[in-house]
Amino acid sequence: MKITKDEINHVAALSRLEFGEDEIDKFTEQMGDIINMAHQLAEVDTEGVPETVQVVDRETDFREDKPEHWESRAELMKNVPEKADGFIKVPVIIDKDDNE
């Protein structure tokens, strides 16, 4: 399967990323190489090889999920990069008029 520049540009637009023409050329070639490698892996004979779900024999230890009350709002807010009227200000990621 051949990856085209148009496909790379489409994915970049969906991701809201901007690249120069030289970067698009580079990514097109790299993605083509990745797809070709995946096709090669699909051809490997794995008959009789047991499935491997996780290569590390270890379980994840989760902490207890319990709410904690913050005594000091000021302590929390001192680590916030942008604030507005006592709230945490975050960047806009979805435009209201975006139809894509």
Curated annotation (Swiss-Prot):
GO BP field: glutaminyl-tRNAGln biosynthesis via transamidation; regulation of translational fidelity; translation
Keyword ATP-binding: yes
Catalytic activity: L-glutamyl-tRNA(Gln) + L-glutamine + ATP + H2O = L-glutaminyl-tRNA(Gln) + L-glutamate + ADP + phosphate + H(+); L-aspartyl-tRNA(Asn) + L-glutamine + ATP + H2O = L-asparaginyl-tRNA(Asn) + L-glutamate + ADP + phosphate + 2 H(+)
Record InterPro entries: Asp/Glu-ADT_sf_sub_c (IPR036113), GatC (IPR003837)
Keyword Ligase applies: yes
UniProt xrefs under Pfam families: GatC (PF02686)
A molecular function GO annotation: glutaminyl-tRNA synthase (glutamine-hydrolyzing) activity
Signal peptide stretch: none
This protein's UniProt keywords: ATP-binding, Ligase, Nucleotide-binding, Protein biosynthesis
Subunit field text: Heterotrimer of A, B and C subunits.
General function of this protein: Allows the formation of correctly charged Asn-tRNA(Asn) or Gln-tRNA(Gln) through the transamidation of misacylated Asp-tRNA(Asn) or Glu-tRNA(Gln) in organisms which lack either or both of asparaginyl-tRNA or glutaminyl-tRNA synthetases. The reaction takes place in the presence of glutamine and ATP through an activated phospho-Asp-tRNA(Asn) or phospho-Glu-tRNA(Gln).
Name this protein carries in UniProt: Aspartyl/glutamyl-tRNA(Asn/Gln) amidotransferase subunit C
Native organism: Lactobacillus johnsonii (strain CNCM I-12250 / La1 / NCC 533)
Higher taxonomy: Bacteria, Bacillati, Bacillota, Bacilli, Lactobacillales
